[in-house]
From Swiss-Prot:
Keywords: ATP-binding, Carbohydrate metabolism, Glycogen biosynthesis, Glycogen metabolism, Nucleotide-binding, Nucleotidyltransferase, Transferase. Alpha-D-glucose 1-phosphate binds at Y101, G166, E181, K182, S192. Involved in the biosynthesis of ADP-glucose, a building block required for the elongation reactions to produce glycogen. Catalyzes the reaction between ATP and alpha-D-glucose 1-phosphate (G1P) to produce pyrophosphate and ADP-Glc. One of its GO terms (molecular function) is glucose-1-phosphate adenylyltransferase activity. PROSITE patterns: ADP_GLC_PYROPHOSPH_1 (PS00808), ADP_GLC_PYROPHOSPH_2 (PS00809). GO terms for biological process: glycogen biosynthetic process. Pfam families: Hexapep_GlmU (PF24894), NTP_transferase (PF00483). Belongs to the bacterial/plant glucose-1-phosphate adenylyltransferase family. Homotetramer. This is Glucose-1-phosphate adenylyltransferase. Its EC number is 2.7.7.27. The gene is glgC. It comes from Bacillus cereus (strain Q1).
């Protein structure tokens, strides 16, 4: 029997991320590079480490190899523990054959044995594909104080975007009275962040109930949470007011990277009290040539800059040759940009080679973002 834990985190990291197009052709969405030196999953894992959550199960499925290699034993996030720590949980074969995760609830249900060994009081369920910084221990305190069966972290979203999210309708005490999955005509703009705290006994009971229902799609938002409400369980909304971004599309991924370049951003990567940890690529120092110009940009290790870079994010090992301009763009690891190239409002994928004289910018709508990438 493993050492008993008060709270165990389960991090859902198996999503395909098809809206990110070629960036996720051969890569799980949580492993997509972000912010010049990170992967998307770094934010959730760092939140766990900073919140004192020491036992994390990571549920993977789609294109898991690079993600598994990246996570390793969790030492980058100080989660390489003798008891607990990080455990990668892909689907596995039983006597009846391999059982794939069919939904978010299915993924947790198939790993109830993993949870049971820790005898937790609470289970924190997380998504590995959002950008935010959050102290989960404060949410757990709120959950306990409110004597909730389930607590769901929510954030106010613009009304014209509310129909894209699971929306919570609450009373004055922030108790959830109705849950609507992507409503056409929302009555609230409190969106679910995909962060749940369950009392362990409730989670186990309702996942087993959901698994027995042949009509269920095995999803928390569509099936489990509405059932809990129907049966009178106490669901509380936990309001979150910091930065949070769903980077599920090429444009939203670009926007989140651009947010890092603002003079005042609520997503401060320089906060020494809440560090975002990552695997160190061990590249040499960046080199900025004499005639190069760099403004308002994040430039990681191993970059060689001989041209101009303005308001952009460059990952490790990027080369920008003489005469080239990179403006309002994200250039992912190892990309090579030749001479006299113009790149504007674009994401350039890992290891891409941009030939001399190429011009890359939105052709029709100036608000668009261009993606130049190939699945490896």
């Amino acid at each position: 029997m493993a050492q008993k834990q008060k709270c165990v985190a389960m991090l859902l990291a198996g999503g395909k991320g098809s809206r990110l197009s070629a960036l996720t052709k051969n890569l799980a969405k949580p492993a997509v590079p972000f912010g010049g030196k990170y992967r998307i999953i770094d934010f959730t894992l760092s939140n766990c480490a900073n919140s004192g959550i020491e036992t994390v199960g990571i549920l993977t499925q789609y294109q898991p190899l690079e993600l598994h290699n990246y996570i390793g034993i969790g030492n980058a996030w100080d989660l390489d523990r003798v008891s607990g720590g990080v455990t990668v949980l892909p689907p596995y074969a039983e006597s009846s054959g391999v059982k794939w995760y069919t939904g978010t609830a299915s993924a947790i249900y198939q790993n109830l044995n993993y949870l049971s060994q820790y005898e937790p009081e609470y289970v924190l369920i997380l998504s590995g594909d959002h950008i935010y910084k959050m102290d989960y221990s404060k949410m757990l305190d709120y959950h306990i104080e409110k004597e909730a069966d389930v607590s769901i972290s929510v954030i106010e979203v613009p009304w014209d975007e509310a129909s894209r999210f699971g929306i919570m309708n609450t009373n004055e005490e922030m108790e959830i009275v109705e849950f609507e999955e992507k409503p056409q005509f929302p009555r609230s703009n409190l969106a679910s962040m995909g962060i749940y705290i369950f009392n362990w006994a409730i989670l186990k009971e309702y996942l087993e109930m959901d698994a027995r229902n042949p009509e269920s799609s095995n999803d928390f938002g569509k099936d489990v949470l509405p059932l809990l409400l129907d049966e009178g369980k106490k669901l509380m909304a936990y309001p979150f007011e910091g930065y949070w971004k769903d980077v599920g599309t090429v444009k939203s991924l670009w926007e989140a990277n651009m947010d890092l370049l603002r003079d005042e951003t609520s997503l401060n990567l320089n906060d020494r009290d809440w560090r975002i940890y990552s695997v160190n690529p061990n590249e040499p120092p960046q080199y900025i040539a004499e005639k190069a110009r760099v403004e308002e940009s994040l430039i990681n290790e191993g970059c060689v800059i001989e041209g101009d870079v303005k308001h952009s994010v460059l990952f490790q090992g990027v080369t920008v040759e003489e005469g080239s301009m990179v403006i309002d763009s994200v250039v992912m690891p190892g990309a090579k940009i030749g001479k006299n190239v113009v790149i504007e409002r674009a994401i350039v994928g890992s290891e891409m080679v941009i030939e001399d004289g190429t011009i890359i910018r939105p052709e029709k709508n100036v608000d668009d973002v261009v993606l130049i990438a190939e699945g490896k």
